[in-house]
Amino acid sequence: MFRIWIYLNLSNFVKFFFLKKNYKIIISYIKNTLGKQSKKKYVLLTSQCRIGFLYILKYLKKKNPKKNEIIFSAYNLPEMINVAKNLNYKIRFCDINYKTGFVNLNQIQKLISNKTNIIVLTNMFNTYQDSLKLKKIAKKFKINLIEDNAIYFDNFSKNRKKNYSGSVGDFSIYSFNIMKNVSSLYGGAVTTNDYNFYKFYDEESKNLSDFNFLTLFRQILIFMILKIMSINILYKFIFFKIIKKAHKQQNDFILKIIYPSLRFIKKKFPNYYFTKISKMSLFFTYLQLKNKDLRKNNFNLRKQKNIHYFKNLVNLRKNKILNLIKIKNFNYQNFLDFPILVHNKYKFNYFLLNRGIEIRFKQYYNCAKMFSNREKCKNADLYEKKLVCLPNHPKISINYANYILKNIENYIFRYNSM
């Protein structure tokens, strides 16, 4: 079973070419939906998540020119760090807690100085309560909190009322890229209550060009390739063999298609960054946001598998081979892939590939190692070396999840017998 699931379905893709579209209605609906979830008044739509992030950083540097420091979780996506680097921010990295995957709150307070302008809250493994604790620190020191909600969209915590991820930060950023659970090829958004930022972006966006057609066309080709790869019979007899061989031979050309983060290189902003969101991405985002029943069903199917993996793996973690991230709330920590930490993930990956199982081998990186020689973030380094993810998308059945679990159990038994 192909581990990747593109949430944009082919029927929605085809509709773009045949349905009449009122973009005022489309944009209004997207903004209302994101505004309600994030509890923010202003919603701005961008060509990518990182572009929204870029303009927030430009705005906050202009607003506070004497404050030039930004704090990130060290375990992160390098493209986001590169945005701050290219804008000449002084970047500080905070290590993560090994048990939870969230930033070390004691360390983050030690990193804060009178020049700290921004803390980035990356929703990745955290609970809602974790986010509130970080918000309290940011508020105490009068620091802007940017909440990266790229991989947590629709996740929520419910006590008396629902609180969605994306509702904590002073600014919240969203991604509708091809691999996300709202998949629109490209696309992103910023939500905030800061009217001055709204005016700033409105003025800046006048200089943006239309989204580059060739860039969009390349993404459409990738979309088509991934859809073809997800056809079970083709995947089983053709594509799985190619993927397996690519892993064993470290074939970058193939691996970069299924792991976009491998394409990262440190560079200045490419021209396609400074573009508006395409009409195609707007339309796809609108259709998926409007289909609440499908989103809820996908959410629950993913949660079901996450709970199933956790309950079955929790008793297997009492060894040096496998560890689990602490999960307190399966609604808020409803991961797009189920993360586990394994000793020698190369060996683990090859063992599963030899049994017809594909897992997510690469997630994020220890960006402190990539961008700085100053901060040694050992837990982020361990996550980069140990973390893999099990598939949990709508087409993964409980029977197939059990097959994966059985092989993990066999791997641990074999490893302990050696």
Give, region by region, the residue ranges found by the protein language model:
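Active-site PLP-lysine loop of aminotransferase-like
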Residues: I173-Y186, F200-L214, F223-K245
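Conserved PLP-anchoring active-site segment centered on the Schiff-base-forming lysine
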Residues: I56-S113, L352
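Conserved PLP cofactor-binding pocket of PLP-dependent enzymes
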Residues: N212-L216, N312, I325-N329, K345-L387, ...
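Active-site-adjacent capping/gating segments
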Residues: N159-G169, F361-I404
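Conserved glycine-rich beta-strand-loop-beta hairpin in the small C-terminal domain of fold type I
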Residues: R3, V14-F16, L255, Y259-R295, ...
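Active-site phosphate-binding strand-loop segment of PLP-dependent enzymes
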Residues: K99-E203, D210, H393
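Conserved PLP-binding active-site segment in aminotransferase class I/II-type PLP enzymes
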Residues: M1-K66, L87, K139, L294, ...
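Conserved PLP-dependent catalytic core of the aminotransferase class-I/II
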Residues: I30, D210-F213, F217, I257-I265, ...
